Amino acid sequence: PTFHRSRSHDYVAKEVKAVRENLGASEVASFANHKFTGSGARAFLDRILAGHMPERGRVNLSPMLLESGKLNGDLTVACIDDETYYLFGSSVAQNMHLRWFEKHLEGVDDVIYKNMTDDFHGIAISGPNSRELLSRLTREDVSSDAFKFRDIRDTFIGGVPALCVRLSFTGELGYEIYVAPQYQLKLFEEIEEVGKDLDVKWFGGRALMSMRLEKSWGAWT
């Protein structure tokens, strides 16, 4: 079977086509979420991450390295305000990263760390019509100039408090929306209802991997 296309091939192709040409949605369940707060949060993250730190309301992609220079993590770092930062990374490497954070937090008294993986449940929307869908779910201006690529904001989407970032692993226009677990079903239902006439289609992990490969997006776990 490994030398032939799987039986899921045609279904995956339909999901990819929906995202590429119109609009798709997917649960974001494969990321670990970490929160750092405090007056020393920025300096701490600037020390353990190899990339540039983002400005307020922005996100950057940043590697995390071992002392030897080897890759220890590929993370998305978000700056909510001067003392609040989120890191999104691999759920597979979550415990390894937790140990790394704890090791470097020893003796640091101006940073508070919290694992937020169980507190954040996400849904991603992607495709040419994703901005139209988002505009129907929120009262805020989500035009390209007002909500730029790699912008992040606390807002209300579908009537529930949410953290929204303009970022997509599909390589298409897209957004990731994170809410507390008790609001995820509400968000799901709102996307289904509001996106009905847009013909929103749900897509899975195989479609996501196919699309990110076609756009040369790397993956590290």
Predicted regions and their residues:
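Glycine/proline-enriched, intrinsically flexible loops and inter-domain linkers
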Residues: 1-221
